[in-house]
Amino acid sequence: MARGGAGAEEASLRSNALSWLACGLLALLANAWIILSISAKQQKHKPLELLLCFLAGTHILMAAVPLTTFAVVQLRRQASSDYDWNESICKVFVSTYYTLALATCFTVASLSYHRMWMVRWPVNYRLSNAKKQALHAVMGIWMVSFILSTLPSIGWHNNGERYYARGCQFIVSKIGLGFGVCFSLLLLGGIVMGLVCVAITFYQTLWARPRRARQARRVGGGGGTKAGGPGALGTRPAFEVPAIVVEDARGKRRSSLDGSESAKTSLQVTNLVSAIVFLYDSLTGVPILVVSFFSLKSDSAPPWMVLAVLWCSMAQTLLLPSFIWSCERYRADVRTVWEQCVAIMSEEDGDDDGGCDDYAEGRVCKVRFDANGATGPGSRDPAQVKLLPGRHMLFPPLERVHYLQVPLSRRLSHDETNIFSTPREPGSFLHKWSSSDDIRVLPAQSRALGGPPEYLGQRHRLEDEEDEEEAEGGGLASLRQFLESGVLGSGGGPPRGPGFFREEITTFIDETPLPSPTASPGHSPRRPRPLGLSPRRLSLGSPESRAVGLPLGLSAGRRCSLTGGEESARAWGGSWGPGNPIFPQLTL
């Protein structure tokens, strides 16, 4: 009877081997088509699309490696009675199958979690770099799945009767009790997490959001029309997250946040994710969990368990492409997929700076700016300007898109001063040029500090030049002229060398108003200075600072800004040094 049972088992497995091979090839092509279709339809890969592509890639590996290996071995055994499983092939099959089974379970759970997060907390989802978190989640999923599934191949199995001794018995009860329990618990956790997240998503979509919309309409009907007219906030059916494009002071886009989806798109994506979760739970998760439980309970692996596990794994790889194809958002025709294949082969889509992104159901084209916030010299020719579609992000609807200007000093500096409080010109490059390496001293006599005569003479000449420039067009004219025409060259000519005096930079800093109330005062008309009371600005750490007697530790240490009043300078008349400071109290 044992031989007859073994013969029936072998016959059932061999009769299904050809079907597994054909279905595996079809699943491989279908999932590859889905990946190309998603890539072609969505120019900007969002976390949800990335997880769908990873799930399709996992199914490709499932159909290509373990299922195809099992089918080929069964066909070889059918063709030759001497051929059988060996230890290496069986270990590779078991490791790859359980790695991909766990990776599929966790990827589906992560997909449902991201959808719940996006629907329930839309603002937090867009501000939390969900794409990076999705990539990290996929890396963790594959690492955990691979480590756990590789342990049976390196010794974590039943040593009494090894699973690769007679054939390849890959059901968890034949591998070992410890592995079977760990695998079943992880599988159960992934299934429960996916179902809970889908339930919260459906509740938020079908009940919570319509209830808030009714409350908003009720509030808008009471007083919203008086407050804001037809476009008041109270008359909106629900809260919408605006699309945000973040740019720096140079006009270059640094990052962007997508706005709220339309009701149709949101419902389509929610239905797709829910269908994928229920598909996996009904065809793969629950059947494999039931088989594992009964096999561990009875410590046996009858043929129906092997057939059920293999066919359930094959069915999910075939049905996932059909589910994604049913969603209009990710459905692409043959021409679009072919163009995507050509672009991938020619590596035309590798440069992200020249591409276009999809925001607010329109197209946005990135425009590169120079240091002044204007387009480069080559784009001044009207013949080189390309026409954009009628609906794009350069002129977006005001309630849908917001543009933010984030200067470089705000992103890269530790200074927490609110630089947005002071209005600036859009083309201004130096929104804030820190003067932390300068020192301003107003002595009673310019020669009292013991400065070198060469420097003092140069200083007087520079002050006379500054007075002449300010009389002509303002003290900031030379620096702004350098920024506006010195970089690109005036009139399109070659740029002049950056021959820029330090005193001009210091004057620009001191005459530029800062937003902080405790900062230096803003630009004011220059008052006539008494003879000998010319401001002198030295750098902490320069040879001039050591010549006038600054402490060595201060000049070699942290740079700071020191400002002294005119009264303190008049009250002090002697020499000064480390033990006799010029100012009674200084803040570093």
Curated annotation (Swiss-Prot):
It is a multi-pass membrane protein. GO terms for molecular function: G protein-coupled receptor activity. Pfam families: 7tm_1. The modification Phosphoserine is found at residues 413, 435. Residues 1-17, 71-91, 155-174, 297-303 are extracellular. It is found in: Cell membrane. The chain crosses the membrane at residues 18-38, 50-70, 92-112, 134-154, 175-195, 276-296, 304-324. CDD domains: 7tmA_GPR153_GPR162-like. Glycans are attached at residue 86. Keywords: Cell membrane, G-protein coupled receptor, Glycoprotein, Membrane, Phosphoprotein, Receptor, Transducer, Transmembrane, Transmembrane helix. InterPro entries: GCR_153/162, GPCR_Rhodpsn, GPCR_Rhodpsn_7TM, GPR162. One of its GO terms (cellular component) is plasma membrane. Residues 445-474, 511-550 are annotated as: Disordered. It comes from the Eukaryota. Residues 530-546 have a biased composition (Low complexity). Residues 39-49, 113-133, 196-275, 325-588 are cytoplasmic. Orphan receptor. Belongs to the G-protein coupled receptor 1 family. This is Probable G-protein coupled receptor 162. It comes from Homo sapiens.
